[in-house]
Amino acid sequence: MQVASVLSRGLPYIQRFTGKTVVIKYGGNAMENEDLKSSFARDVVLMKLVGINPIVVHGGGPQIGELLERLNIQSRFVNGMRVTDAETMDVVEMVLGGQVNKEIVSLINAHGGTAVGLTGKDANLIRARKLEVVNRSPELERPEIIDIGHVGEVASVNVDVIDMLTRSNVIPVIAPIGVGPDGASYNINADLVAGKVAEAMKAEKLILLTNVSGLKSKEDKVLTGLTAQQVNDLIEDGTIHGGMLPKIRCALSAVENGVRTSHIIDGRVAHACLLEIFTDEGVGTLISRN
C-alpha cells in the first residue's frame, strides 16, 4: 500500500514534466558514496522512463587533485580556481573525459539506461573562451590580469547535438571541458556548464547537487522556496556568501534566462533528484524567477 501511495502522489508531477528537460549538475558526496552513486543512476534512468529528458553535467575536482598528487604535479589556486597549464590540462582531460565520465555512463547503463559520454569538444558541444581573472587589490595602481592558463567560460552550447541525443532516447553525460577558437581545451566550472546548458536548452529545471541541505537563513533554517529577487536580497545582506555564491549565481542566471526553476539540493540524500521533482516537500531550495 505504501508503494502505491508513493506512486499515486508522484503521478501529477510525472504528467507535468513528461517531455521536459532537466539538467543535473552531479558532484560532491553523491559522486563519492557507492550507495548514492547507485541511487543517482536509478533516478536518472527512471526520469527517462517516465518521459523526462535528463542531461547530466558532472564535476571531478577531487579526482583531478588525486591524480595530480600521484603524478607529483603541484596544484595552485587563484580565487578558488585551479591554475591549469598544458600539463595539468592533460590530466584534467584524462580524469574528466575518461575516468569520471565513463564511470557515470557505465553506472547509468548498468541500471537500464542508455547513456552516452561527451566532453564539450565533441561536435563543438561547448565552445569556450579563456577566463580572465582580474586582481583589483587596492595596493595596485591599476587592475592586474592574472593568467590562470586553460581555464575557460562558456561562449556557446551546441543544442542540436543534445537535441539529437535526447530525441533518440539517449541520456547525455557531459564533462565540463570546452573547446576554444584555436582548438585548445579549457577546464570550465561544472556548475557554470550545467547552468549554460540549461539556459540554451530552455530546460524546465536546473538541479545542482551539493553537500548542503539547501540555502539557509541566518537562523540556520532551510529556505525551501525563493524568488530571484529574494535570493539577490540574501546575497546583498550577506546571508549567502563564500563558496555557495558561484552556485547561486549560476542558479539565478538560469531562471533569468529561460529556465523555469533552479534547485539547490542535498546530494547526500538517497534519491534526492526524485524527491525534489516528484514530491511536495523536496530536499533543498527551489528558486524561481518570480
Swiss-Prot record:
The record marks 25, 247 as: Transition state stabilizer. Gene3D superfamilies: Acetylglutamate kinase-like. Catalyzes the ATP-dependent phosphorylation of N-acetyl-L-glutamate. HAMAP family: ArgB (MF_00082). Belongs to the acetylglutamate kinase family. ArgB subfamily. It is found in: Cytoplasm. It comes from the Bacteria. Signal peptide: none annotated. Pathway: Amino-acid biosynthesis; L-arginine biosynthesis; N(2)-acetyl-L-ornithine from L-glutamate: step 2/4. Its EC number is 2.7.2.8. It catalyses: N-acetyl-L-glutamate + ATP = N-acetyl-L-glutamyl 5-phosphate + ADP. PANTHER family: N-ACETYLGLUTAMATE SYNTHASE, N-ACETYLGLUTAMATE SYNTHASE, MITOCHONDRIAL. GO terms for molecular function: acetylglutamate kinase activity; ATP binding. One of its GO terms (biological process) is arginine biosynthetic process via ornithine. One of its GO terms (cellular component) is cytoplasm. Keywords: Amino-acid biosynthesis, Arginine biosynthesis, ATP-binding, Cytoplasm, Kinase, Nucleotide-binding, Transferase. This is Acetylglutamate kinase. Substrate binds at residues 60-61, 82, 187. It holds the Pfam family AA_kinase.
